[in-house]
């Protein structure tokens, strides 16, 4: 009987880390599936941390910093009460991303006819690849793009709504009042970007460009 008890204990010791790793992998899969909802519908997770360094509890609290990447090799904080451990995790995510549908020259406008969505592994893409095709509305390419090339945020800009030297309408508003005046834009700016304007008096003011090309200043 003693031999049997010892055998059971040894088996429990040998296989408990495997069971813990399996449960933790499932928890991590659920964690990243929730984080990537709407972006990826196919997530695979593998733990790279050694089994003896895994959290000691069955249901650790998992978290990541707000600016962390959600795929590739990442670090996840696992808490068991006061015990904190960082897990090295590899996340593979599959979903849609935006590519050039045809050759696009630098300075060309990105529109429905020359960009498209493609499905593939998001974790293997260049940094800051565009996932939402709506981000390219009224965008201008900053470099030549080849067919099927993933489009990155650094490769385009929004079309200028206001250009340097243009006469613009400045609208200053505050609590219960609003005033309009004209001035000259000192820089190029897209919608929702800041533009500096020299007023007739010579004073330089700064405001946000709206969809109509007005410069809005909140006082």
UniProtKB/Swiss-Prot annotation:
InterPro entries: Flag_basal_body_FlgA_C (IPR017585), Flagellar_FlgA (IPR039246), SAF (IPR013974). Keywords: Bacterial flagellum biogenesis, Periplasm, Signal. SMART domains: SAF. Its main location: periplasm. Residues 1-21 form the signal peptide. GO terms for biological process: bacterial-type flagellum assembly; bacterial-type flagellum-dependent cell motility. It is found in: Periplasm. GO terms for cellular component: periplasmic space. It holds the Pfam family ChapFlgA. Involved in the assembly process of the P-ring formation. It may associate with FlgF on the rod constituting a structure essential for the P-ring assembly or may act as a modulator protein for the P-ring assembly. Belongs to the FlgA family. This is Flagella basal body P-ring formation protein FlgA. It comes from Escherichia coli (strain K12).
